[in-house]
């Protein structure tokens, strides 16, 4: 008897790394995630960054050609079933938005630029889901432009860092002439150890039960060690030291001939070995296992585990609110009105059903006063700074940018020329959220326990109207009336109309 599975669906995750782009496709069957295929293309994106931190046309073109190939596999996929994360190089690139806009022409799915801390958390999640459970794990991932180091238990990362040292940028800095020498290795190792100085003692003190390495650099080291006769593939400091001695037997990177070392990994292999050697020494790692799981697997598992994802963001916002002594009762009232107002004008704003901007508005409402912990004067700017620069687990860079802009424009004059540019979201939608949040804040400005009568918000282009079934509602709320008149003037200054 054959059982027909009706609830299977395919999901895909893409990792836009500094050295290579990776795609993994999986099938979700009931509660099981079955990997179907992996795809990898070396694009050397980091090599295209010039001195002004702009990507050159050649590297952009290499990236677009790879994404066009990925697009063939993803034909018919719904946007909710594809997640694309960009890492270090696109974090650094000043023209990242240009690349993302051109990428949308060949691969019509949103690209998220994720902070280093979020990259580290997702890497840990990918390893944790694909390895036997240990009481605690250290995970190290050496990418093209950055290295992530995470200690956690179960599926939760507890200590994480992302350092700007990768196999591509360290190759350019310490092996630029293609020469292999003890001097070049020593310089690269010392530079790596300097990057680790501020965090190494924390990692040693916290400790871990098992160490895992993920992604291309550590995979290559693992396979070369097997080729050297270490059948268990374990990485140790002693084996790394001997590997460096072995590499110095060649004068040039181009001449390297090692079993297990592929041609595409060869140019950046020496720098990767140097970085990992420094990490072993600085963190006092005894041995490391290789893990197939990494960032893209973390993206996959988080896509399917949506409740866990929501819990992470809820925990992040709650912790940030507690840290900055936010008045949660007041914030909840603002959040409630923001939710109601947005539901009333969402169609006019053109917001698609289920848009994540609805969630971001609620998070923004909860956190709009975090800046009060710094100073009452200009607290909206302080709030914006905190939300832009904090490590916020569960949020990518652009989501944090939305929160920051909501905080920045929650009150006072609307200097819209200071509004940031977005690649994942339309600016008109962000402006709509700003209007909604401002009104939710104004109607709760009295900060008292007297309930407001039910309010109705409607919008037609730049004319918005706030109404109440009780005709004399503002007669009984003189202070609110004055606040609305002040808000009305702020709107008038930018060509908007607020009626009430």
Swiss-Prot record:
<dbReference type="InterPro" id="IPR030673">
    <property type="entry name" value="PyroPPase_GppA_Ppx"/>
</dbReference>
<dbReference type="InterPro" id="IPR022371">
    <property type="entry name" value="Exopolyphosphatase"/>
</dbReference>
<dbReference type="GO" id="GO:0005886">
    <property type="term" value="C:plasma membrane"/>
</dbReference>
<comment type="subunit">
    <text>Homodimer.</text>
</comment>
<keyword id="KW-0472">Membrane</keyword>
<dbReference type="InterPro" id="IPR048950">
    <property type="entry name" value="Ppx_GppA_C"/>
</dbReference>
<dbReference type="InterPro" id="IPR003695">
    <property type="entry name" value="Ppx_GppA_N"/>
</dbReference>
<comment type="function">
    <text>Degradation of inorganic polyphosphates (polyP). Releases orthophosphate processively from the ends of the polyP chain.</text>
</comment>
<protein>
    <recommendedName>
        <fullName>Exopolyphosphatase</fullName>
        <ecNumber>3.6.1.11</ecNumber>
    </recommendedName>
</protein>
<dbReference type="Pfam" id="PF02541">
    <property type="entry name" value="Ppx-GppA"/>
</dbReference>
<dbReference type="InterPro" id="IPR043129">
    <property type="entry name" value="ATPase_NBD"/>
</dbReference>
<keyword id="KW-1003">Cell membrane</keyword>
<dbReference type="InterPro" id="IPR050273">
    <property type="entry name" value="GppA/Ppx_hydrolase"/>
</dbReference>
<comment type="similarity">
    <text>Belongs to the GppA/Ppx family.</text>
</comment>
<dbReference type="GO" id="GO:0006798">
    <property type="term" value="P:polyphosphate catabolic process"/>
</dbReference>
<keyword id="KW-0460">Magnesium</keyword>
<dbReference type="GO" id="GO:0004309">
    <property type="term" value="F:exopolyphosphatase activity"/>
</dbReference>
<keyword id="KW-0378">Hydrolase</keyword>
<dbReference type="Pfam" id="PF21447">
    <property type="entry name" value="Ppx-GppA_III"/>
</dbReference>
């Amino acid at each position: 008897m054959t059982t027909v599975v009706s609830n299977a669906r395919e999901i895909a995750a893409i990792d836009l790394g500094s050295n290579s782009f990776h795609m993994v496709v999986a099938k979700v069957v009931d509660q099981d995630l079955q990997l179907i295929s992996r795809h990898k293309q070396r694009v050397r994106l980091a090599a295209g960054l010039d001195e002004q931190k702009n990507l050159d046309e050649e590297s952009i073109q290499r990236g677009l050609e790879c994404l066009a190939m990925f697009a063939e596999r993803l034909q018919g996929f719904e946007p909710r079933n594809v997640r694309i994360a960009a890492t270090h190089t696109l974090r650094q690139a000043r023209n990242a938005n240009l690349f993302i806009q051109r990428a949308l022409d060949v691969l019509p799915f949103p690209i998220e630029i994720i902070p280093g801390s979020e990259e580290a958390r997702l890497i840990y999640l990918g390893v944790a889901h694909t390895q036997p459970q240990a009481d605690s794990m250290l995970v190290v991932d050496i990418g093209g432009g950055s290295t992530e180091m995470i200690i956690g238990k179960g599926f939760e990362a507890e200590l994480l860092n992302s350092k700007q040292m990768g196999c591509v940028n360290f190759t350019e800095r310490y092996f630029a002439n293609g020469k292999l020498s003890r001097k070049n290795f020593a310089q690269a190792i010392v530079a790596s150890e300097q990057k680790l100085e501020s965090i190494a003692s924390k990692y040693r003190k916290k400790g871990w039960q098992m160490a895992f390495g993920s992604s291309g650099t550590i995979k290559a080291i693992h396979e070369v060690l097997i080729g050297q006769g270490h059948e268990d593939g374990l990485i140790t400091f002693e084996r790394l030291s001997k590997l460096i001695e072995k590499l110095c037997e060649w004068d040039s990177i181009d001449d390297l001939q090692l079993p297990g070392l592929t041609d595409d990994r060869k140019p950046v292999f020496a720098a990767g070995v140097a970085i990992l050697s420094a990490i072993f020494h600085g963190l006092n790692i005894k041995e490391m296992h290789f893990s197939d799981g990494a960032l893209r697997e973390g993206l996959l598992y988080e896509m399917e585990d949506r409740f866990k994802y929501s819990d992470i963001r809820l925990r992040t916002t709650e912790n940030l609110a507690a840290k900055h002594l936010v008045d949660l009762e007041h914030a909840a009232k603002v959040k409630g009105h923001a939710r109601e107002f947005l539901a009333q004008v969402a169609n006019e704003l053109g917001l698609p059903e289920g848009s994540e901007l609805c969630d971001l508005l609620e998070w923004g409402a909860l956190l709009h006063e975090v800046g009060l912990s710094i100073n009452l004067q200009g607290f909206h700017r302080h709030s914006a700074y905190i939300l832009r620069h904090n490590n916020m687990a569960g949020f990518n860079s652009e989501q944090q940018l939305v929160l920051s802009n909501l905080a920045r424009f929650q009150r006072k004059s609307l200097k819209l020329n200071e509004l940031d540019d977005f690649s994942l979201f339309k600016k008109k939608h962000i402006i709509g959220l700003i209007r909604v949040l401002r009104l939710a804040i104004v109607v709760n400005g009295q900060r008292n326990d007297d309930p407001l009568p039910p309010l109705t918000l409607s919008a037609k282009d730049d004319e918005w109207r706030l109404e109440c079934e009780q005709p004399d509602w503002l007669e009984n709320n003189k202070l609110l009336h004055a606040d609305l008149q002040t808000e009305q003037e702020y709107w008038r200054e930018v060509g908007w109309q607020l009626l009430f």
